[in-house]
Amino acid sequence: MMGIKSRHLYDRLTKIVIDKDLSAFNEISPSQLIPQLSEHFSITIPKEIFNYNEDQEEDLLHRLKELSRYLVVKFAKRDKYPFTIQRICELSYHPLQYFPVHSLQKFVSAMEKCCLVNTDWTPRLGKECPNTNPMEDVSLIPIEWIRTNKEDEKSLQAFISKIETIVAVNFGYDDFDDDNEDGTDHDIGRGYDNHGDVLIEEYEEMDEEFEDEDYEDHEDEEEDEEDEDNDSDVDEMEAEEVEEDASDDISIGEIAENDDQDNAHTDVTDTQLKYNGVPIEEELRLSSTSSVLSVSSHAANEDENESILSRKRNVTELDDYQYKETKENDGFITTPKKSKMPLNEFGSSSSMVSPVVSNQEDPSRNDDSRINTFISPDTTNSVTQAEKNELSTSPLQDKKRM
């Protein structure tokens, strides 16, 4: 009996839920059915049908008792049913059909939604139609006011034809579509019949113009790209020429500087020898060590200049300002102050030879061959030994003595 203890309640619920017979609500008064139904869903269902735990689900049992009390006070005393009475009977008759055994909380929530209402239930008016025969459908039942005699049928056909003409008003649009389908266009407002052909020709001309414009734009883009490539090639060639000119100018400037230095050195040497009264050829034939060193150093400088001229300077060497300084041996040693003197003053001073160089000479030679360079241009007298020693002394040694 689905846990229902009252046989009378079980029969009523079976008739309502299974047979769908709602006349049972008219046979029994609400004051009798609602108290029995409330006791069943508030006490029997939670304790005997669901898995009830007193420690954890005592609150749910209290909520069901409040619902049963609400139905008795709100509807049973007024002898009325709530409008959800059919759904309440379904949940109370077979609760496990809708909820699992361990879902007592869901059952309580569903009962609260059905019981906490204010609207009363009212019986349905009229007779229930089972709709067993398809001809009993309203859409298939013939209309009563239409008669089926022959006269009415003739008049009905004329009436229907009038209705179709009124409803199917198209205001000439259908005829216009039919004419277009035939391939002819009767344009009365324009005054010519070949309007469609003219439009086709215009579209073709527009397409040709667009194609020509696209072709011209493509050609212009190709020409611009070629011009840019040519300009870039010209710029690269100009840059290479500028770099080559700069390197040539640098090499020419170095050659000119080296020539000026050689000329100045040669002029100083020639002037000094001329002022001393000794020809250049005789000076070069001297067997002294100083003359040999001067000639060899001059030849080495010329070889070095030729090697520098033969080599072309690279562009990257322009940033290298740490040039190597070469020390030139002029054949005589003097102080920096005397080296800056003009040529006339420099010539007036007597030429001096380092004692280190003079000491390396062969002692077997006579004094005349060693002091040949100390002959005065005004007289042919030889310089005394004391004067020779004084002249051959280095200025640096005099400074140390002081």
Curated annotation (Swiss-Prot):
Composition skew (Low complexity), residue ranges: 348-358
Region (Disordered): 206-270, 291-311, 331-402
Pfam families recorded: PPP4R2 (PF09184)
UniProt-recorded Gene Ontology molecular function terms: protein phosphatase regulator activity
Disulphide bridges: none
Biased composition (Polar residues): 371-396
UniProt biased composition (Acidic residues): 206-248
Localization terms from the record: Nucleus
Sorted UniProt keywords: Nucleus
InterPro entries: PPP4R2 (IPR015267)
A cellular-component GO term for this protein: nucleus
Function according to Swiss-Prot or TrEMBL: Regulatory subunit of the histone H2A phosphatase complex, which dephosphorylates H2AS128ph (gamma-H2A) that has been displaced from sites of DNA lesions in the double-stranded DNA break repair process. Dephosphorylation is necessary for efficient recovery from the DNA damage checkpoint.
Family the entry assigns: Belongs to the PPP4R2 family.
Subunit organization: Regulatory subunit (R2) of the histone H2A phosphatase complex (HTP-C) consisting of PPH3, PSY2 and PSY4.
UniProt-recorded name of the protein: Serine/threonine-protein phosphatase 4 regulatory subunit 2
Organism the protein comes from: Kluyveromyces lactis (strain ATCC 8585 / CBS 2359 / DSM 70799 / NBRC 1267 / NRRL Y-1140 / WM37) (Yeast)
Highest classification ranks of the organism: Eukaryota, Fungi, Dikarya, Ascomycota, Saccharomycotina
Gene: PSY4
